[in-house]
Amino acid sequence: MNASQRVRVAVVFGGRSNEHAISCVSAGSILRNLDPRRFEVVAIGITPQGSWVLTDGDPAALAISDRQLPEVTSASGTELALPADPGRSGQLVSLPPGASEVLASVDVVFPVLHGPYGEDGTIQGLLELAGVPYVGAGVFASAAGMDKEFTKKLFAAEGLPIGDYAVLRPSQSTLSLQDRERLGLPVFVKPARGGSSIGVSRVSSWDELDAAVAAARDHDPKVIVEAAIAGRELECGVLEMPDGTVQASTVGEIRVAGVRGREDSFYDFATKYLDDTAELDVPAKVDDEIADAVRELAIRAFKAVDCQGLARVDFFLTETGPVLNEINTMPGFTTISMYPRMWAASGVDYPSLLATMVETALARGVGLR
């Protein structure tokens, strides 16, 4: 394939959420692994303030170095915009608007954005308006997958096994006595629309609840409180093929008990991205029957939220079987992320995995489907 036949892919990363840095790291890994013989890459960073900039796409600038997290700034490149006009065919134009110089045109967008203002249906809506195909879930599935309350409601409506939980809306300051008795201790307090374990607290005494809610509300006024589930942490990748069929990956396991010398440790932000202390088993050491059940549930969860493209589905393996925790419609793609690892263990290498995602996005197109 010559250069003129390559698919032009805009890799969009950074963004306004508190997962900005992890989005950058994921993008760096993707930029290293997109096959240059098949794809021409346009690297677009979004600053924490929301400005879009055309960058040089250097993966080294998007890595964690000495515990320092990467960030997109206005100095990272040339400021640009994507007009919400399907007649412009994926054109990226310079700013200010009066200049209107076309800096690049793209065939498909890979929105490597984690958290609100990206993974939650917002950029997906923009891309639909602009008429540009994109990798991953559509507007509805992205929004539903981002909000843990509605994810659980959709899972429950399909008869999928979930844990007990309660929701604190902005007008509610704490849990009722009835909710406390129902959930028991310990509980996990989380921003309802967040990821990467940012703002998550483990509460072992109700005296700790108010501080945990305040920590979660630093990131989201809506908070979810989940009953702790005793079990192993399993994950499974789901991938949609260009013909619309859906496949599930090898199952992986995250082992975090006792990390950093604490009995109450969990897979928090530092454990995931900074300390390198969690142990990741791919494939998970589980019976074939359990692995098959997890893969089946992962595909059912994918379909329950009307997902497209890809997802990572997280589980707890309890004494009575797997319980769904959540779905990630744009999982991490860092060098230590489980999603590409699970697919590699399934026989799909990183470049082939990315190529399938892009091909599926192009086959799906935009609009009602």
Curated annotation (Swiss-Prot):
InterPro entries: ATP-grasp, ATP_grasp_subdomain_1, D-Ala_lig_Van_CS, D_ala_D_ala, Dala_Dala_lig_C, Dala_Dala_lig_N, PreATP-grasp_dom_sf. One of its GO terms (cellular component) is cytosol. Mg(2+) 1 binds at residues 314, 326. Its EC number is 6.3.2.4. One of its GO terms (molecular function) is metal ion binding. It is found in: Cytoplasm. Its cofactor is Mg(2+); Mn(2+). Mg(2+) 2 binds at residues 326, 328. Keywords: ATP-binding, Cell shape, Cell wall biogenesis/degradation, Cytoplasm, Ligase, Magnesium, Manganese, Metal-binding, Nucleotide-binding, Peptidoglycan synthesis. Binds 2 magnesium or manganese ions per subunit. Residues 152-359 form the ATP-grasp domain. Pathway: Cell wall biogenesis; peptidoglycan biosynthesis. One of its GO terms (biological process) is cell wall organization. It catalyses: 2 D-alanine + ATP = D-alanyl-D-alanine + ADP + phosphate + H(+). NCBIfam families: D_ala_D_alaTIGR (TIGR01205), PRK01372.1 (NF002378), PRK01966.1-4 (NF002528). Cell wall formation. Belongs to the D-alanine--D-alanine ligase family. This is D-alanine--D-alanine ligase. It comes from Mycolicibacterium paratuberculosis (strain ATCC BAA-968 / K-10).
